[in-house]
């Protein structure tokens, strides 16, 4: 099992390194580079635009939609219905009216974004009022933003914008919104997204298989321990 976990970790590291390279430096290694106005993101192609985040998104704060399904923000699956994510139980203390509305295509900054990036909403529903909901002003850029917001350099940027000392930390969007992010030309955004999706289609399949195998091995190990403790299995 340890070997499988090592393989999984290596695959994820290689994937993330490739994504970080593509979303910040592009696909052409020969183009001239410039320093991004947000130093954490390193160098970007000279012809790429830079724009403050607050000019790329509007903030959604709609509430009072109690009939919408409750959503949760996951680092592996994006923003999905709570019913689809069995490993997490969301406790609502103040009723559904106080939860924020999320629409398909929004991006959600959660209390875990400082660890895993900003999540994309694949479903409409309602979510914790503590989260920041961002709607892209130009939806055609969403596919590129999905990659940028989950990249290591951007997560490092998020970690400079946190507030709070509890286990989950808020991202200060008034601070994050003033940070510059790279905006490649539309044609290059499409090329980057296609390149990453095509290159990692097989890798993603291998990652899923490894995750399932590791989960099975852990469950099998727990069953063996339980059988030994309860006397169902003889231990020599």
Residue ranges and their predicted role:
Residues 96-100:
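Short, surface-exposed secondary-structure edge patches
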Residues 1-31, 183-236:
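Amphipathic alpha-helical coiled-coil/heptad-repeat segments
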Residues 113-117:
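Short, charged beta-turn/beta-strand-edge "cap" motif at the junction between a beta-strand
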Residues 111-112, 125-132, 165-190:
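A short glycine-rich beta-alpha junction/loop motif
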Residues 62, 66-76, 101, 118-129, ...:
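Short, surface-exposed loop/turn microsegments at beta-strand edges and helix-strand junctions
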Residues 54-93:
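DNA target-recognition patches
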Residues 36-65, 182, 186, 190:
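Non-catalytic DNA-recognition/assembly elements of restriction-modification systems
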Residues 103-106:
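Structural motif
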């Amino acid at each position: 099992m340890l070997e499988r976990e090592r393989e999984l970790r290596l695959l994820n590291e290689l994937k993330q390194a490739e994504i970080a390279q593509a979303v910040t430096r592009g696909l052409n290694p020969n183009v001239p580079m410039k320093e991004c106005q947000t130093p954490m993101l390193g160098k970007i192609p000279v012809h790429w635009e830079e724009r403050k985040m607050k000019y790329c998104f509007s903030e959604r704060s709609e509430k009072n939609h109690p009939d919408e399904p409750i959503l949760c923000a996951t680092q592996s699956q994006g923003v999905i219905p709570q019913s689809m994510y069995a490993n997490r139980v969301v406790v609502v203390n103040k009723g559904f009216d106080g939860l924020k509305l999320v629409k398909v295509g929004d991006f959600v900054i959660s209390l875990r974004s400082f660890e895993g990036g900003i999540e994309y909403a694949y479903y409409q529903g309602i979510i914790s009022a503590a989260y920041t909901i961002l709607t892209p002003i130009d939806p055609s850029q969403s596919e590129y933003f999905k990659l940028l917001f989950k990249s290591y350099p951007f997560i490092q940027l998020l970690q400079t914008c946190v507030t709070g000392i509890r286990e989950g930390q808020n991202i200060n969007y008034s601070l994050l919104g003033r940070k510059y992010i790279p905006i490649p030309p539309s044609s290059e955004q499409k090329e980057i997204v296609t390149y990453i999706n095509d290159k990692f289609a097989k890798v993603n399949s291998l990652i899923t298989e490894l995750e399932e195998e590791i989960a099975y091995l852990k469950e099998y190990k727990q069953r063996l321990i339980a059988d030994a403790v309860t006397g169902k299995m003889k231990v020599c």
